[in-house]
Amino acid sequence: MGMGMRRERDAEAELNLPPGFRFHPTDDELVEHYLCRKAAGQRLPVPIIAEVDLYKFDPWDLPERALFGAREWYFFTPRDRKYPNGSRPNRAAGNGYWKATGADKPVAPRGRTLGIKKALVFYAGKAPRGVKTDWIMHEYRLADAGRAAAGAKKGSLRLDDWVLCRLYNKKNEWEKMQQGKEVKEEASDMVTSQSHSHTHSWGETRTPESEIVDNDPFPELDSFPAFQPAPPPATAMMVPKKESMDDATAAAAAAATIPRNNSSLFVDLSYDDIQGMYSGLDMLPPGDDFYSSLFASPRVKGTTPRAGAGMGMVPF
């Protein structure tokens, strides 16, 4: 919706204007029904004209301060003198100045001159080298009555309490500029709407990465059992020899140094081989009863023991 249309709808609501209301008064209507009543402090037909000091602003900043209008805007504004004792108005405004063009035109409803109409063009910059713009203003002032009252205040800069101004852009550049802004705003709103469409109702924004994480590309692999590493191989426990050990304990410790799972190593061992194993330990467990039970094993080859020597074998 354009700025002018929004302003008109606001005015329709605030001022209780009928739908489709248009404000296009003639010069006679402006002077007789609005300017004269404003100067006299009377009630206006419709309070639709804003009170703004036009000479404090550039013309392109004024449409936003108007109460109504899309292509032309109306204001009540005071006028000051250029010099304290002179009658020329001060035309400096904003970053430029207004310059009169053409001859003054009397406004005479029903044959009686009530006001004067003057046309002015806005120049940007300082006089006399300002740049002419397309902003036009029609200024309506009362014929002599207002000026006479103001002139009575000697030394005052106020020339007129109120004049009525109609402002417009000759090439309608302001409206085109507003339309360009509206196009940009609509494009921005469209982009924002599209970005919201990619957001779930719970506020989580979906991204390509989240889609990859959420969707398992190989669901059939879930049926395979989890990989379990094999346990490390058993190692032999070494028990150090201590002087305080008795013979039976030392023999058991020596047996523990031999892996139990590798008992096949003793299949071809003879008694002499076994005895040689213990001779390396500088000790032989005493007692023939301890070793005699070992010869019952079918794994050990029978040999003739030496006289006076004990027989022994590590149990497995």
From Swiss-Prot:
PROSITE patterns named in the record: NAC (PS51005)
Free-text comment about domains: The NAC domain includes a DNA binding domain and a dimerization domain.
Region of interest called Disordered, as start-end residue ranges on this chain: 185-210
Subunit structure: Forms homodimer. Interacts with NAC071.
Taxonomy of the source species: Eukaryota, Viridiplantae, Streptophyta, Embryophyta, Tracheophyta
Protein name, entry field: NAC domain-containing protein 2
Gene Ontology biological process terms, A to Z: positive regulation of response to salt stress; positive regulation of response to water deprivation; regulation of DNA-templated transcription
Keyword set includes Isomerase: no
Miscellaneous comment: Plants overexpressing NAC002 exhibit improved tolerance to drought and salt stresses.
Keyword entries, A-Z: Activator, DNA-binding, Nucleus, Stress response, Transcription, Transcription regulation
DNA-binding region ranges: 114-176
Cited InterPro entries: NAC-dom, NAC_dom_sf
Task of the protein: Transcription factor that possesses transactivation activity. Transcription activator involved in response to abiotic stresses. Plays a positive role during dehydration and salt stress. Binds specifically to the 5'-CATGTG-3' motif found in promoters of stress-responsive genes.
Induction text: Induced by drought stress, salt stress and cold stress. Induced by abscisic acid (ABA). Induced by methyl jasmonate.
Transmembrane stretches, start-end: none
Classification via PANTHER family: NAC DOMAIN-CONTAINING PROTEIN 2, NAC TRANSCRIPTION FACTOR 56
Tissue: Expressed in roots and stamens.
Subcellular location: Nucleus
